[in-house]
Amino acid sequence: MQTWKDVIGTEKTQPYFQHILQQVHAARDAGKTIYPPQHDVFNAFKLTEFDQVKVVILGQDPYHGPNQAHGLAFSVLPGIVPPPSLLNIYKELENDIAGFQIPRHGYLVKWAEQGVLLLNTVLTVERGLAHSHANFGWETFTDRVIAALNRHRENLVFLLWGSHAQKKGQFIDRDRHCVLTAPHPSPLSAHRGFLGCHHFSKANNYLQEHKITEIDWQLDTQLS
């Protein structure tokens, strides 16, 4: 069975990957504030091992405000107000999953620990500048991550929200995996079909059909 060490280890030796890291280090060395902090950039892989992945949620690039990003798509650190897209995710969960209570925080580690890979397609960003690292080469890396999951795992659920994620996931084998698409949960597009998509219950139904333990989407309502 593949591990992230195998997948990421292979990529780490590639010139394009070295170039990504050089660009990020150069930006940090120049005094720019880069999110997430260096020790959190690969958090998604630390918290959800390759053979434990059940659901993949693709984000775009990290939040670019102070103390928000910590390496998991859509998640923010404890003590930070949940951003608008995450609030819409919570609204959909409340509508979709019986008894779901909207938490007061946006810390999604509990999902990651159950097998939800919260993967941004670009892993770093400069403070206050959305998409500032979009051309660093991260997309190549995350394409290869998705390709490895597609090839070496079966019966995963991919939740692709918005055109960017859908384009990114276009080569996923629909015969081996469940691919669910909807507009992005951003306030600009959530009302066009994200709200009411029922992706969370559909994901659990698919896992159940394949005798895989479902995700408990409920988070602690507040962190102690």
Curated annotation (Swiss-Prot):
The protein's role, per its UniProt record: Excises uracil residues from the DNA which can arise as a result of misincorporation of dUMP residues by DNA polymerase or due to deamination of cytosine.
Protein name: Uracil-DNA glycosylase
NCBIfam families: PRK05254.1-1, PRK05254.1-2, PRK05254.1-4, PRK05254.1-5, ung
Xref: SUPFAM superfamilies: Uracil-DNA glycosylase-like
Family of the protein in this entry: Belongs to the uracil-DNA glycosylase (UDG) superfamily. UNG family.
Source organism of the structure: Mannheimia succiniciproducens (strain KCTC 0769BP / MBEL55E)
Gene Ontology CC, one term: cytoplasm
EC top class, as a word: hydrolase
EC number: 3.2.2.27
Keywords for the protein's UniProt record, in alphabetical order: Cytoplasm, DNA damage, DNA repair, Hydrolase
The encoding gene: ung
Localisation: Cytoplasm
Classification of source organism: Bacteria, Pseudomonadati, Pseudomonadota, Gammaproteobacteria, Pasteurellales
Single GO BP term: base-excision repair, AP site formation via deaminated base removal
UniProt-listed InterPro entries: UDG_fam1, Ura-DNA_Glyclase_AS, Uracil-DNA_glycosylase-like, Uracil-DNA_glycosylase-like_sf
Keyword Transferase attributed: no
Keyword hit for Cytoplasm: yes
Annotated PROSITE patterns: U_DNA_GLYCOSYLASE (PS00130)
Any Pfam family: UDG
SMART domains found in the cross-reference section: UDG, UreE_C
Gene Ontology MF terms in the entry: uracil DNA N-glycosylase activity
Active-site residues from the entry: D61
HAMAP family in alphabetical order: UDG
Reactions catalysed according to its record: Hydrolyzes single-stranded DNA or mismatched double-stranded DNA and polynucleotides, releasing free uracil
